[in-house]
From Swiss-Prot, chains A, B, C:
Its main location: membrane. GO terms for molecular function: ammonium channel activity. This is Ammonium transporter Amt2. Involved in the uptake of ammonium/ammonia (NH(4)(+)/NH(3)). Transport is electrogenic. The chain crosses the membrane at residues 34-54, 71-91, 120-140, 149-169, 180-200, 220-240, 250-270, 273-293, 295-315, 339-359, 365-385. InterPro entries: Ammonium/urea_transptr, Ammonium_transpt, Ammonium_transpt_CS, NH4_transpt_AmtB-like_dom. It comes from Methanocaldococcus jannaschii (strain ATCC 43067 / DSM 2661 / JAL-1 / JCM 10045 / NBRC 100440) (Methanococcus jannaschii). Belongs to the ammonia transporter channel (TC 1.A.11.2) family. The lineage of its organism: Archaea, Methanobacteriati, Methanobacteriota, Methanomada group, Methanococci. GO terms for cellular component: plasma membrane.
């Protein structure tokens, strides 16, 4: 295996004319696309670990294992739902023949062009799993594990792929510009969470006599490491969204970087040096830039990030004032940041503002409204239906006080610190 | 440096005929292979960090620094052993002239084709280090640090490369299909650990009057983060095993993903929502798919993963019943999962089951038996010899009770929580 | 989006003659360079997370959130400083017209060749941010957050880019061989820290009656995970420094690996199994190899690493003896390791020692001396000026005792373990 090199250069060993060169180049190009989609997809898959740390750090010790299980299991279930349903629904809608062709193909190993279709399937999967796992951060510390698993299954198998199909990545029934999913992934995740949060109700002790009482997480550095891992993975999220090596864009890399910087600085200023808001501001800046990362200038990226970061502490307080317990602030970090990003794309993407053009503010606003209604509405309805189906959406009051780690998984997160 | 772009495109600036184009393409192809092997190798190297977290979370506070040292030092030693011996032994066997040529070459900087041979050497190294570090999880909390270092040196310098040479990646004296090492790396690591565990004996208090008494690790989230890091790295492990960009396979990416999902879901079900078994089930699914990841269908991958995940809690109990103290469950997660994966490759790799064909169940069974005997036998013998050479394999009872962090490294893992 | 493949292979669909093939190849080459620079740059960006863990683990619980904020904010500020000033100053010096052209360009989206210039800009940014964040580890646990932010701004906007411009990556006014920045990044960062440490003074209780009193960090495994993340990122640091896919070098990958091994083993031996020194030895080996990673042999890399690792505990003691409180040992790990690596490049890079040649020991010594003077001098002056500008460089004694997390950020790192 090592030492004897099977080299890609062998492709060109017998290339002696135009035709044979082009044939060899086509193989190299397909292989390069598979490599591109796998590396970018693995970076996005790293965001599952990032979300587990970001959410894990922001919950109490007695619920950390439950967060670990939710973040592992929504990925595991997402893979199966995306293989059998999601991956086809999102591009072909409810076309039964397309499903049957696909089911036949995944029973075999006949995948031409170095398996490019499966690399593309993988890149779609990690986007779907990201949308689903965002909800976890909003409903933490009181949702039943079985309810969360069922909600994840329905999001990854139906709600997300259908939203994709209706939006710009599918049949464009509702067309807006969304290069890497400010609305398709993050806005949807954030507003699905809003609906579920409303259906679920707040944690015990989160509001006392209508007054909000902060419930701090157990490990702030763990949450910051989560933000770092998300920021690293985000380069796969945005730069990978060219879907082909040949269309990769250095501009997307730069606007992603500057929006991250703007998001962190905006939240740092608005929260007066708060560690968690600064970390979440970085994520909000990255959420906001997804939509227009390919059509705004680097300065435009910085501006989008700044606005997205500044709004995080503000919207967090508004959600709290509405009596909603959004544990990890997913509504401001993914919901409203996604909407703001999409709308600003319709402005800073215009040529007069240095953008590449080809965007319309109206389309962006329509997309945003559609996302808010689709997400919040279906998030609420889904949570209520699952609650009925499982005899309740929440663990019992006694279980919530004991902590979900012991109640649902029979194991504390830090055994030597807990008398079992 | 920045701003003035030395671009790869310059390769083609003077390409004016077939010959000059092919020459430039050969350079691009070699450079792309080096880039491919480095990126995939770095993902596998990330698994060293994953193993450090997976094992670190599953030991008590008083032994965490010792786990950190074992996982750093088996890598450091593996680099040296692989440079001087392992990297040649695995492909050329005991051919002295090949060793001499290699030793001359590593004293210099003459490495043609963009140093492709050294990129290939690096990719072989990270596989070797993975096999060695698996043993660490089985022998934790009571092995002498010096004994572990010596065992690692012999595994990375002799036992692993020799096993590679005898198997399908070397001279194929024992031929079986093992695309990314279900047996060559993980089965070997798991059964070497079994042999060493048997030679070492259990931790104090692990069995009382013959009854097993669980000794919980100190940080379950740390272990789960380890499983996430391993899963991320595994895409380098499997997809990188094409060894050349031109042979990359999207099918390998998909079967790896589905086996991960099957492994986690299988262990989740078999352990009734246990956090550690679910995380280890994800790893077991990934171990099992290595062998046939290129010849089974995506559904085949899911099935292999499910079976590998289901068996983890079952085999863990059997090993425990046999009075063996496998701290991190490396026998079920790497040993039996590797064997199951290899054997199922001989079934689900057949054309009648949608596989790509070119596999034989008999070969797979022979390879599995060879791996179990070679690993367990040499693991036991090696541990016994090292024990004799160092005046004992284990730290003293007093040191084991104090904890290896203070006994062997004079520093607690969490200084502010420990009175020194 | 998924399912309908826009493939890179389409580039060659209409390539029917030499000219059209070369045109398509130029696009593929540029896209490959952008992909190369983004992936390598993301690996280096991962080192920000590595530094946050390495430093976070080596400070006490009451200062961990402050370390998180410093490591997030020096990145955020670095992005902005590098976009507006640093990225141009480093290659064009104080050429106003070059600044104006650049500022015009970043207000727009006109970036040819797949945005290759912006990918190159991004790769420069992550190097700059690395140099700045090294200082954080030296000044931890007593510097004002506002002072640190201002120091980072001036390092990333002025001191680092100017040093680059003067050195081998810019106008080469002081020419030495520094492939990936032993001096340009790490030596500079280490000696800037030395100057700032001298200006800042030690932590309360670090020296009692002139005798050094160790102040242990709170989480050694966190620091080791930081070293792992840095080592992973370092492959981007060194292998990415070819700046173009076509010039990638497998030799750089191998010498980087062997220097890492030498560094860890050297520090392990010199510190007699100390966990933190071994982890920092790995980093020191990687620092030292940056300069000559492309011109020394794999054995040369091992030797450079060994020497760099051996010196870490020795220089740490010398700095301590000088009454200087270098919390994370950045002077031996980045400063002197960088100088040693640069000088050894002038020896082991020579042909007689198996090197590729083209290096001069005199140049390397001149570069080292220039770096020590530039770094220590400007580090000291900058810290003093910032101290004056902000009414003091340090937090008050009372704040230092309370801990910077509560004093500067109003939030403990582990809320459930602290009575707020």
């Amino acid at each position: 295996m090592w030492g004897e090199n099977i080299a890609t250069a062998d492709l060109f060993a017998n290339a002696t004319d135009i035709h044979s060169i082009v044939q060899a180049l086509t193989t190299l190009a397909n292989a390069s696309d598979v490599f591109f989609l796998v590396v970018m997809g693995v970076l996005v898959f790293m965001m599952q670990w990032g979300f587990a740390m970001l959410e894990g750090g922001q919950v109490r010790k007695k619920n950390v294992n439950n967060v670990m299980m939710k973040n592992m299991v929504d990925w595991l279930i997402g893979c199966v739902a995306w293989l059998f349903i999601g991956g086809i629904l999102c591009s072909k809608g409810f076309d039964l023949s397309a499903f049957i062709d696909w089911w036949k193909q995944i029973l075999g190993t006949n995948w031409p062009n170095n398996g490019l279709d499966l690399a593309s399937w993988f890149f779609g999967l990690v986007f779907c799993a990201t949308a689903a796992t965002i909800v976890s951060g909003g409903v933490a510390e009181r949702i039943k594990f079985s309810a969360y698993v069922l909600i994840s299954l329905i999001i990854t198998g139906l709600l997300y792929p259908l939203f994709v199909y209706l939006g710009p990545w599918g049949a464009s029934i509702v067309p807006w510009h969304d290069y890497a999913g400010s609305l398709v992934v993050h806005g949807l995740g954030g507003f699905l969470a809003l609906g579920a949060i409303a259906a679920l109700g707040p944690r015990i002790g989160r509001f006392v006599d209508g007054r909000p009482v902060p419930i701090l997480g157990h490990n702030i550095p763990m949450a910051v490491f989560g933000a770092f891992a998300l920021a690293i993975g985000w380069y796969g999220f945005n730069v990978g969204s060219s879907l082909a090596l040949g269309d990769i864009s250095g501009l997307v890399c730069a606007t992603t970087t500057m929006a991250m910087a703007g998001g962190g600085i905006g939240a740092l200023i608005a929260s007066r040096n708060d560690v968690l808001f600064t970390a979440n501001g970085i994520v909000a800046g990255l959420v906001a830039i997804c939509s227009g990362t390919d059509v705004v200038s680097p300065i435009g990226g910085l501006i989008i990030g700044l606005i997205a970061g500044l709004q995080v502490p503000i919207v967090y307080k508004l959600v709290e004032k509405a009596g909603l317990d959004d544990v990890c602030g997913v509504v401001p970090v993914h919901g409203t940041a996604g909407v703001i990003g999409a709308i600003l794309t319709g402005i800073l993407g215009l040529k007069i503002f240095g953008g590449a053009g080809g965007v319309s503010l109206i389309d962006q606003i329509i997309g945003a409204v559609f996302c808010i209604i689709y997400g919040t509405g279906l998030g609420y309805i889904l949570a209520k239906i699952v609650g009925i189906a499982l005899g309740g959406l929440r663990v019992s009051e006694e279980e919530e006080k004991m902590g979900l780690d012991m109640a649902e998984h029979k194991m504390p997160a830090y055994p030597e610190e807990t008398v079992i």
